[in-house]
């Protein structure tokens, strides 16, 4: 959910959904982790790299940079989760077919229980499919195989 992704489908709705869940985690005093992608168009500290201003990120949250779609690859995320005895994670963000999909599959292979904030994920239209088609396609693959879907009314399961 970085500035470089300004053309995300239903961006404002997704940000509002994510913020509601972030607020629930903050109220429960549970960790909130932000993963920021870095590449030539999204260099660290650049405007494109920065999180959307509207996200309810706090200085006390945990932040990692990544260079691959996999949020675990050379980030310290797996160590953080294990050191904090967290065996389940909740995922939200963008982009469905890149970072979200890869992170779900890697987390699954690492043995984590995964909950997906289904209204808190998005992507952009491709040359072949709309963002909604991409999301629906991936959701059909993930559901009950790799992850369970949650909403902002679901209890937090950590």
Regions found by a protein language model. Name each.
Residues 1-6:
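Short acidic, Gly/Ser-rich segments with clustered Asp/Glu that frequently serve as metal-coordination loops
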